Regions:
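N-terminal start-of-chain detector that recognizes signal peptides
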Residues: 4-6, 16-20, 43, 106-109, ...
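Intrinsic low-complexity, intrinsically disordered segments enriched in polar/basic residues
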Residues: 2-4, 25, 147, 154
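Conserved acidic-Pro-Pro-aromatic motif
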Residues: 47, 108-111, 117-210
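Non-catalytic N-terminal targeting/anchoring module and adjacent flexible stem/linker
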Residues: 1-14, 210
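SAM cofactor-binding core of SAM-dependent methyltransferases
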Residues: 17-113, 120, 141-143
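Alpha-helical protein-protein interaction elements
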Residues: 7-9, 54, 88, 178
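Detector for methionine-enriched segments
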Residues: 1, 8, 85, 100, ...
Length: 210
């Protein structure tokens, strides 16, 4: 198995039992999320950037199939319409708008952010509305020195993390996301080539020593 195909792995020994559950879409993330759901029993799932679910598995599709309330956001109209046809029990919205989260019990939720661009700023908007049990946020770690710190004049640094460079959306690197989300009370428990998985700190004892 090449590095680009390696499964999601736990970041610390105390979470190493999760490695045995790394299976399924995309690099084993779904299997680890399923293991976490067995511990935390979420009552809500939110996927922002759910267009992959048009033809590929939804990351949290296993919870939708179990009847857990699911809210999907997909900006692309064609993909959105396809989701409405194939995921009929989900609540489906277009562009992400944090106001759509009003009234939802985020404290009992799993949230996935996968928009190929402004992932961290969107994740932060979610965190300002509530504190999910689990958050998985897409990252991008292949900047290279030519991209530097990515802080152009006139733009707040956090929004720079989604700018286009040569037509490619620059996403926050994993270390940057981990540093920023720590302030909200989360710990990185596992990481794949493209996703970082975080758990709310008060729930960590549930995962230790398993």
């Amino acid at each position: 198995m090449t590095d680009t195909q390696s499964p999601m792995v736990a970041t610390e020994l105390r979470f190493a039992w999760l490695n045995d559950r790394a299976d399924g879409w995309q690099f084993g993330e779904t299997g680890i999320l399923e293991a976490l759901s067995e511990r935390f029993d979420p009552g809500l799932t939110v996927e922002i950037g759910a267009g992959d679910g048009q033809s590929l598995p939804l990351t949290l599709g296993f919870l939708l199939e179990k009847g857990v309330k699911t809210v999907l956001f997909e900006a692309d109209e064609l993909r959105q319409n396809a989701l409405k046809m194939t995921r009929k029990t989900a609540v489906i919205h277009g562009f992400f708008d944090a106001r759509m989260l009003d009234g939802l019990e985020l404290s009992q939720s799993f949230v996935v952010v996968d928009v190929d661009g402004q992932d961290w700023p969107i994740a932060e908007e979610v965190l300002r509305c509530g504190k999910p049990q689990v958050m998985m946020i897409e990252h991008y770690d292949e900047f290279g020195p030519r991209y530097g710190r990515c802080e152009p004049e006139g733009l707040p640094p956090r929004w720079c993390l989604g700018l286009l460079v040569d037509g490619f959306p620059i996403q926050a690197p994993a270390k940057e996301i981990e540093k920023r989300i720590r302030w909200y009370g989360y710990t990185l428990i596992a990481k794949s080539r493209v996703n970082s998985l975080f758990v709310r700190n008060d729930l960590l004892p549930t995962l230790e020593g398993c």
